[in-house]
């Protein structure tokens, strides 16, 4: 009677491992091993010259309300202290 649960567990493990190991996806145009034919790649991907600028110029966004560096430092210090107080509680 003790052998039945062992064989049932072994059967389930083999069943699930076979399902996981049979998970290779075959796409159209793929050869076994995941290698594509180089001629078909050239046909699929045509180079598009200069459609998108590589490094667009960034706009500078400025705040309409000037803040002093002291206020920014004070805010950062207060946030840090609040975080330390939460850790202690």
Swiss-Prot record:
Expressed in the forebrain from larval stages. The modification Glycine amide is found at residue 33. The keyword Signal applies. Its main location: secreted. GO terms for cellular component: extracellular space. The modification Pyrrolidone carboxylic acid is found at residue 24. Keywords: Amidation, Cleavage on pair of basic residues, Hormone, Pyrrolidone carboxylic acid, Secreted, Signal. It comes from the Eukaryota. It is found in: Secreted. One of its GO terms (molecular function) is gonadotropin-releasing hormone receptor binding. Residues 1-23 form the signal peptide. Belongs to the GnRH family. Stimulates the secretion of gonadotropins. This is Progonadoliberin-1.
């Amino acid at each position: 009677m003790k052998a039945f649960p062992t064989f049932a567990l072994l059967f389930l493990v083999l069943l699930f491992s076979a399902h996981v190991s049979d998970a290779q996806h075959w796409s159209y145009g793929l050869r076994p091993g995941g290698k594509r034919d180089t001629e078909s790649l050239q046909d699929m991907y045509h180079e598009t010259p200069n459609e998108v600028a590589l490094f667009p110029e960034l706009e500078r966004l400025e705040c309409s309300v000037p803040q002093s560096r002291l206020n920014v430092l004070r805010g950062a210090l207060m946030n840090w202290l609040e975080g330390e107080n939460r850790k202690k509680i």
